[in-house]
Amino acid sequence: MEPQPAKRLLNECDTPTRTHYLILGMSWAGWLFDFYDLMLFSFLVIPIKRSLGLSDSSLSLLVGTTLAATALGGIVFGWLADRFGRKTVLSWTILVYSLGALLCGFAQGAAWLAVCRIITGLGVGGEWATGQTLVGETFPARMRGRFAAVMQTGAPLGIAVASVIGGFVEPALANAFGPEWGWRGCFFISVAPALLVVLIRRHMPESDVWLERKRLATPQETSQVKFLLTTPDLRRLFLVGLVLATTDMSAYWFTYSWMPRYLYEHLGSSMGRAGIWMLVTQTGGALGYLSFGVVADWKGRRVAYTIYSVVWAIGLFAVTWFWGALAVYPALTVLFMFLVGLGTGNYSGYGPIFSEIFPTRVRNTAMGAAFNLARGVQFFTPLVITLVATRYGLGGGISLAGFFALITGAWVWTLPETRGRKIGVEGR
């Protein structure tokens, strides 16, 4: 008979405990600073361009290179987390992206900056899957969607912090110490998340599901990657999940990669005002992430995905195609910018869906690879926007996000409904 877990698993508890909230808090903070470090560059792109004399194509390449690096980071750190543990690898990813941010502050040209952004991308790529795997493996099935959504709110809050740093702190530092030190100072500040590693190492427990799975593992088992790719059902789920993540992330990065610049240069907003518009969007995003989890636990993952994708598309088409008309009615402008953020709440679906369709043995590997390969494809997003903008304007390029959002809302129905599915040691 197969040995049984030595004790009750955390995900078998009736209600969340202090340990659950500790895991959630650390994973959430790691994701917040992960997304902050990823997005900060977009809010500093104008002073960086002036300081280093970079072209638009070079800036697009830098954004794309960072996203491509996340793909490699997701695969490598996902495999490491299945091998060495979620807690350990979560710490590694935070140290890596914090190091990348620090080094960006010393950059002297495009090549140097590219290397620094690659380092940032590697760490960023590994953090999400590890944090969501921890939450998915430790929280009870009936409330997994809600708490995965709470972790996901780190993304809009991270962008909000980046918008404040880029829109207000950068000008203040530039005025005080000179233009060169505005954006550099912002990157130096961004090394602070490394302190989070101390708290994780001292206070956060390892996933008990992973520990039990490791205890039961045999030397004869095939590698995680081989098992994932040679098992027909898992391979199909991985590919379908990869397409879902790719279309959704295309919608996301077509929205955000040039949105601050669109607001600043093409709509005549000041950097501070552009930052305020982004804060409106991220307020909607935070509410969207939280409410998505409730809807997903109530009506199912697929229904929630479709609803939020449609809302996202409506908001995007309004602010890119009809901004001139909206400008006459400030309340409508606020509403549709808010809807853009609200629709991105479907990002909260990745964690529970991917946690529930993949077994413990390959969960972190599969989640990290699917999520970050999809994000790596976004290397082409800023390049496509730049190309489309030459004919249809920057708003026309960004509006492509609406079409990808609608595709996502339809494609999610190719995956099974997993609401309420239990996560055990050996499988799903």
Map each language-model feature to its residues.
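Cytosolic juxtamembrane N-terminal segment immediately preceding the first transmembrane helix
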Residues: M1-Y36
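C-terminal ends and interior cores of transmembrane alpha-helices
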Residues: L95-Q108, V311-L326
